[in-house]
Structures are given as C-alpha cells and as structure tokens.
C-alpha cells in the first residue's frame, strides 16, 4: 500500500508493524535504513554498518521527510520512503554523496521507540 504525505513524500509499506505503537514528536526511535539515490546508488546504510540508527523524531534532528514519515510507521514496520529534494537535503545536497535537490529513497524498519 502506498501513501503520499506532506512534502510529496511517498510511503510504500513493505511489511506491517504492530499497528499499535507509533512514535510521537520528540520520541527517541531506533531505525535500520538503507539510503539510495533514485538511480539505485547507495549512499548510506545502518544495515551495512550492523548498527541501527537512533534519533529523536519530529524535532528537526533528521531530514524533513523522515520527520514527516516515521511517525506514520508502527513498531516493526518496514517501508520504502521516497523523499523529494526539498524534504531531503535540498539545494545544498550533501557534498560528495548527494547531489543538490536529489530525491532520495530509504528502505527503513522501525525497530523500537525507546
């Protein structure tokens, strides 16, 4: 099932979570992710590092697309997030890794709300 939310961020649900526990703004979450450019070129992966990523969601610690999409996932859910440039790294990109205004694709799994 695919859903488009604010910022034209797309959420493609790959496997369900518990459908009960959703993070709220300010919650510390633990996530596994793999980030690619639209052409499939991988730029980062917590899975490859073998270490999940933790952040406070909904408070500007991560890109806007994550702040918008992660609260729509329940614990255990896997999804593919397609995030347009303005909700990713915008016109500055991430030099050496992500071109300016690039649309990014993240395969994410919400492991837990800490």
Swiss-Prot record:
Its EC number is 5.2.1.8. It catalyses: [protein]-peptidylproline (omega=180) = [protein]-peptidylproline (omega=0). Its main location: cytoplasm. The gene is FPR1. This is FK506-binding protein 1. It is found in: Cytoplasm. Residues 26-114 form the PPIase FKBP-type domain. Belongs to the FKBP-type PPIase family. FKBP1 subfamily. The keyword Amino-acid biosynthesis does not apply. It is an enzyme of class 5 (isomerase). Keywords: Cytoplasm, Isomerase, Rotamase. Inhibited by both FK506 and rapamycin. One of its GO terms (cellular component) is cytoplasm. GO terms for molecular function: peptidyl-prolyl cis-trans isomerase activity.
């Amino acid at each position: 099932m695919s859903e488009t939310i604010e910022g034209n961020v797309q959420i493609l649900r790959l496997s369900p979570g518990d459908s009960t526990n959703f993070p709220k703004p300010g919650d510390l979450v633990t996530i596994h992710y793999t980030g690619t450019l639209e052409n499939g070129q991988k730029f980062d992966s917590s899975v490859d590092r073998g270490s999940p990523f933790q952040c406070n969601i909904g408070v500007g610690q991560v890109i806007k697309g994550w702040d918008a999409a992660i609260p729509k996932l329940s614990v255990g859910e896997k999804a593919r997030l397609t995030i347009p440039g303005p909700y990713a790294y915008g016109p500055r990109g991430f030099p050496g890794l992500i071109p300016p205004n690039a649309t990014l694709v993240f395969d994410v799994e919400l492991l837990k709300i800490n």
